[in-house]
Amino acid sequence: MAETANDQPAKRHSGRRERSEKAILGATRELIAERGVGGLTIEGVAARSGVAKTTIYRRWRDRDELALAILIDMTAAVNTPPDLGDTRMELLTFVKTATKIIKMDRIVQGLVSEIATKPHLARAYRERIVDLRLAEVKSVIDRGIARGDLPPDTDVRVAHELLVGPLFYRLLFTGPPLNKAHANQVVDAVMRAFAPR
């Protein structure tokens, strides 16, 4: 079908919106990295991004929604590991991807502390991020059960918590680097914990 003159303004508007959103999210990420979530303001984002405050408020109600948008944007790249025919490798792929995101230290630390103190953010985080990751781990666990690598009664939620929990604990409390060796240790521990008996 041929493009009409009426299609042009819509395309321009869509492109402008995408550029504005990219500038806003980029500025937000930079400001959180520099100042933490506590130092994030809509005024600061507007100044850094060059986008009007009214445009920002049209999309995000407040600083908390903007901070959550960063977390959603950061985790968007995570998706169900492909079927590799090897449950351990699929879980390792998931943990390595999660590690890459969590290693954005200052940003993640700031966002996690905000989530811990604000129930509405915690709820949104669970609904828009955790539940998605849980579904991805469930796909891997289901394949592992079908292969006989994991028992049929494997608790997906517990497996997910065991895969991701050590990453946050190390980042926030104990301090050693998150690296491939640690990812392997986490996955091996989970595989042993759920090994068919």
PLM region spans:
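Core residues of bacterial helix-turn-helix
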Residues: S49, R59-W60
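Basic, helix-initiating cap at the start of DNA-binding domains
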Residues: M1-R48, T54, E65
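C-terminal peripheral helix-coil segments that are non-catalytic and often amphipathic
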Residues: M1-K11, M89, T93, K100, ...
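Hydrophobic alpha-helical segments that form the core
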Residues: P152-L172, A183-V190
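Hydrophobic alpha-helical connector segments
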Residues: V78-R106, A159
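Short amphipathic alpha-helical segment with a characteristic S/N-K-E followed by hydrophobic residues
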Residues: I24, G39, D62-A67, A77-V78, ...
